[in-house]
Amino acid sequence: MIRIFKKLLNQNFSLKTNMFSRSKFFFIWEICYLRFLYFFLVKKSFKFFEKIEKNTIGVEYSKKSFYDGRIPIYRPDERILLPFFNLLSDPNLEKEKILILGPRYENEIFIARAIGFKKIYALDTFSYSPLVETGDMHNLEYPEDFFDAIVCGWTLSYSTDPQKACNEMSRVLKKNGSVVVAVEKVSLKEREKEESKKITGILTGSSRIQTKDQFDKLFEGLECVSVFDDKKGKVSSPFIITYKKN
């Protein structure tokens, strides 16, 4: 039993690439939950990027989730899965190197491995995970034309300069590579007011990035290949968009 547990915690632990059923994706969540308990609660592992620019907001708000006494509930979540399903809509997608921005609990890392990516880079402003580098999405320390795919899930809203962040994503993306961005589309003003109270400086109103026209300007020169706009939510709903660098 101890041997199995140690294997699950191993940084090089990999999943077979044919795991696409809901039950097998749930297995990923279980692994990440065990790793969180081990690295954060047992080993007290936590690192923080000190050189964050003023463009990034909500760091203290997000970091608080690790220290407010709540242990995260792990279950398959469409917020995590949908960006990858949009990415996989490209039948010619190369699966050599992928960059994941904002993988708080490692789920995206293991999903990327499960769907076949060979080299996975993960970046966040803070993390307990040895699989995640700390850094700033406005200043990516990677060479140009480096990644076959980029997943930016639910992090762009924490930027006061989304153009700079998107420019960096475009710069490090390879030709024929794809970048997927997921944001929360807010349709109720009261929800925006609540967010602005919790997160100082978050963009609201027409400045909030949540439409195709806005993203087309941010990723000028790239081709929009997929849009998922779930308009069912009365308060907010997922908006996921994919661009390809031709």
Task: Name every feature range the model reports, one short phrase each.
Residues 149-161:
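A short SAM/SAH-binding and catalytic strip from SAM-dependent methyltransferases
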Residues 163-178:
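A short glycine-rich, Lys/Arg-flanked "PGG" loop and its adjoining helix->strand segment in the class I
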Residues 220-246:
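Core SAM-dependent methyltransferase catalytic element
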Residues 180-216:
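Conserved class I S-adenosyl-L-methionine
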Residues 93, 160, 174, 220:
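Short conserved AdoMet
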Residues 138-150:
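A short acidic, Gly/Pro-enriched loop at the edge of an enzyme's catalytic core
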Residues 97-139:
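Class I SAM-dependent methyltransferase SAM/SAH-binding core
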Residues 23, 27-91:
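Class I SAM-dependent methyltransferase Rossmann-like catalytic core
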